[in-house]
Amino acid sequence: MLAKIGAYLHTLPSPKPPGSSFTRSFPTSITRESIGSILNLHFYVPRDFDEQRQRGKRYPVVVNLHGGGFTLGTPTDDARWARMVLQELDAIFVSVEYSLAPEHPYPAAVEDGVEALLHLAVEADELGIDPTKMGLSGFSAGGNLAFTIPMKLYTYLEASDKKAVNQRSTISRIGSTAIPRVVSIVSWYPILDYTISRDLRRTNSRRPEKTLPSFLTNLFDQSYLPSRDEIHSPFVSPANAPDHLLVNALPHDIAMYVCEWDMLYEEGTRFANRLEGLGKRVDCTSIEGKPHAFDKSPNPFSVDPQVDMLYRAACVILRRGFHGEGPSESLI
């Protein structure tokens, strides 16, 4: 309830965040376990989208994953970010309503993200999307998904054991022209390494009193990962992914935003340095004097002007991936 109140207060300051333009729902189909569930995608599109789509225009797309510890949050939480994307980029913004724990623990959210990318690629002509120009963005838990989803998609596409993938799935139907190409990632204050305890993170943080409370982080972690057996998986802890997976599955252009007072600050900077060492073009911004989810402050009277500045800077990274020079896409 408190999370819902905070999210509502976040929508009050001017300029008002936009509502989604339309929602598209489709049945999931990748794994046998997920068959029959419905996934919703919330679209934010440019004003002249319908006219331009009918003329054959194909837009880049930013696929967004909201935060909330894999247990809370809605696909409209990042509407202010969507507004900036529409303002700064000639692109479509799609927010994924992925499955939440504890009803749907790992790997449901990751698989939903893969489903979303494949659906957008397969239906690209109808939706006015250029499937070769996809950007991923995510906040907190969604920042984790922005890395784990392309890695999971890569392993699905590369899998030699087709028994692991439902033969009626979207993967079995795609051709080379429908394979989604992720060209950039923007990850905001992501959780990246579940092998590190929350207590250790909190102790090592610069302002422990500013970090999320234990009761909340325990709820998040126990809901998403009821068993600790998966904490070393790269699809849970991307910081533990092998080099070859990071090199092949992730795009060249990556932006990360880490908050100085966040317990996730250290693992974020370490991961950014590792990616840079692997040859990725990484823009890692340290946001001084700010806690986790600083941009979602429930202040009903104003929005921190730094938020718009950072959102606008993130759009530069996305634009570089969509239209820039040099190698910028993952190998999936």
Which stretches of residues belong to each language-model region?
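Alpha/beta-hydrolase superfamily serine-hydrolase fold, recognizing
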Residues: 17, 26-332
